[in-house]
């Protein structure tokens, strides 16, 4: 009877369950989208119970559709949208407020206040992160400050906080395990990535009671077992956890210092493994934990792009100038260039290296001759320019030149984007055979803990190249195009509307 690892990939817009066999090949996939809530401009929320029911649904579906029994599952790995924050009542199991999503800007005023009080460096020096609404800490404070009775309940020990991994493990284990892993803890603004513990000073600044917080574990170990009533009568080990971007780094077998991967999902995320030494950034990158394994912690530098694949979604759903995401490649290749049109997709601000949360999207260089093909091409190119911004910062901080870029995420299927990416960064872009690297990374972490796979070496040997895109553009063109992008970003940052 063949055995499998199940990966739960809980993302920003959907939950998926993916089965991997011993070869690391995909045996089955089930996916379910869930509702996005936008209560005010710039706010993004999810219903944590909807997330939970979507996860139960895909777990059931992937087994049923592929006629696999629950006793064929050796372990479960969880990878999750990071920073998204849930607080729930531990007695009733009910969330006290919607989950506040990583993209949400509703804690802007809290961040501003902490900066005004001069605390930015304190957070930076201990967590490797910036004081930005993106991270979980200010979201926790917001919920405690804004939900009636929440603070009192938290101080009495009746509430629990978790990122989505923590919430799912708590639910799957029937409330027995309140845990997270190093990679997720490192995204909270409350965890000291050098001392590897929740930081009392930061908790005081955010006014967050310590009893709210989960226990931090390695990224690969048996944390708990599923309750049999959640998993067809089986108690299956939950044995791997990593935030989505760290899971993708692991799934891309980026185990050596200097290895880099870039994910083109809803947002864009580049991570460089910096080994067992954290690298402090002078260029607006984040210092974060890649994973904890075998008693060691590996660190990473990370660049975050807030709008990547979601810009293509916007062309489809917002402007309705394409019918499907793949169609964007067709339109973009009908013209030789953007005809000097630049699009800066700063819908929710600009991430690395600018960290300008007040910037908003802008289009430059329009003329009477601009057609939709030019604009669609400019949108696709914007993903690549933002990636170069991050890559330059990364090389500068780490003093490591990036020689090849491993890529994953929905947009990598677009050959135009991949070729333009190679051209604009002047580096080979490697698209792997298995592009579900986030889910694969979680599966690898879970599988290592239960002996399904033996070692990182075995995993590294399984990585296979599908297509390599090599630079074709002249240095002159590359320099000119990128210079235009930098001007467009600069102009975007200047344009600010008063409240």
UniProtKB/Swiss-Prot annotation:
The modification Phosphohistidine is found at residue 230. Glycerol binds at residues 82-83, 134, 244-245. GO terms for molecular function: ATP binding; glycerol kinase activity. The keyword Kinase applies. The keyword Calcium does not apply. GO terms for cellular component: cytosol. ATP binds at residues 12-14, 266, 309, 313, 410. ADP binds at residues 12, 16, 266, 309, 410, 414. Pfam families: FGGY_C, FGGY_N. Its EC number is 2.7.1.30. It catalyses: glycerol + ATP = sn-glycerol 3-phosphate + ADP + H(+). Keywords: ATP-binding, Glycerol metabolism, Kinase, Nucleotide-binding, Phosphoprotein, Transferase. Homotetramer and homodimer (in equilibrium). Belongs to the FGGY kinase family. This is Glycerol kinase.
């Amino acid at each position: 009877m063949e055995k499998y690892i199940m990966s739960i990939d809980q993302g920003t817009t959907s939950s998926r369950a993916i089965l991997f066999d011993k070869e690391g090949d995909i045996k089955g996939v089930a996916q379910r989208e869930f509702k996005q809530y936008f209560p005010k401009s710039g706010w993004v929320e999810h219903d944590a119970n909807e997330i939970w029911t979507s996860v139960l649904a895909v777990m059931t579906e992937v087994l049923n559709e592929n006629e696999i029994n629950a006793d064929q599952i050796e372990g479960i790995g969880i990878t999750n949208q990071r920073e998204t924050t849930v607080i729930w009542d531990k007695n009733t199991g009910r969330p006290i407020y919607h989950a506040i999503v990583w993209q949400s800007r509703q804690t802007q005023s809290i961040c501003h206040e902490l900066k005004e009080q001069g605390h930015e460096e304190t957070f930076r020096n201990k967590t490797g992160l910036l004081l930005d609404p993106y991270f979980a800490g200010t979201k926790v404070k917001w919920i405690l400050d804004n939900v009636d009775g929440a603070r009192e309940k938290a101080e009495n020990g009746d509430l629990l906080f978790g990122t989505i991994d923590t919430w799912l493990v708590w639910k799957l284990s029937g409330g027995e395990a309140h845990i997270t892993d190093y990679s997720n803890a490192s995204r909270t603004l409350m965890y000291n990535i050098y001392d590897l513990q929740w930081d009392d000073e930061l908790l005081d600044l955010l006014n967050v009671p310590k009893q709210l917080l989960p226990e931090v574990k390695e990224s690969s170990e048996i944390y708990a077992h599923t309750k049999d009533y959640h998993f067809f009568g089986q108690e299956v080990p939950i044995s791997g956890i990593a935030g989505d971007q760290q899971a993708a780094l692991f799934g891309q077998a980026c185990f050596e210092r200097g290895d880099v991967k870039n994910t083109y999902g809803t947002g864009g995320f580049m991570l460089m493994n910096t080994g067992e030494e954290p690298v402090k950034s002078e260029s607006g990158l984040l210092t974060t934990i890649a994973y904890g394994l075998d008693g060691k912690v590996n660190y990473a530098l990370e660049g975050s792009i807030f709008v990547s694949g979601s810009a293509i979604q916007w062309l489809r759903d917002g402007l309705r100038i394409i019918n499907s995401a793949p169609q964007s490649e067709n339109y973009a290749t009908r013209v030789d260039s953007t005809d000097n049109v630049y699009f800066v997709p700063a819908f929710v601000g600009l991430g690395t290296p600018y960290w300008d949360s007040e910037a908003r999207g802008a289009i430059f260089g329009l003329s009477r001759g601009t057609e939709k093909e030019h604009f669609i091409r400019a949108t696709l190119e914007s993903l690549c320019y933002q990636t170069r911004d991050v890559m330059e910062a990364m090389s500068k901080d780490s003093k490591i030149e990036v020689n090849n870029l491993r890529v994953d995420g929905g947009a990598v299927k677009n050959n135009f984007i991949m070729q333009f990416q190679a051209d604009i960064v002047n580096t080979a872009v490697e698209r792997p055979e298995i592009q579900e690297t986030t889910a694969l990374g979680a599966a690898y972490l879970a599988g290592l803990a239960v002996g399904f796979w033996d070692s990182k070496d075995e995993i590294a040997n399984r990585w296979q190249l599908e297509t390599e895109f090599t630079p074709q553009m002249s240095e002159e063109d590359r320099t000119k195009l990128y210079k235009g992008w930098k001007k467009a970003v600069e102009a975007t940052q200047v344009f600010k509307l008063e409240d």
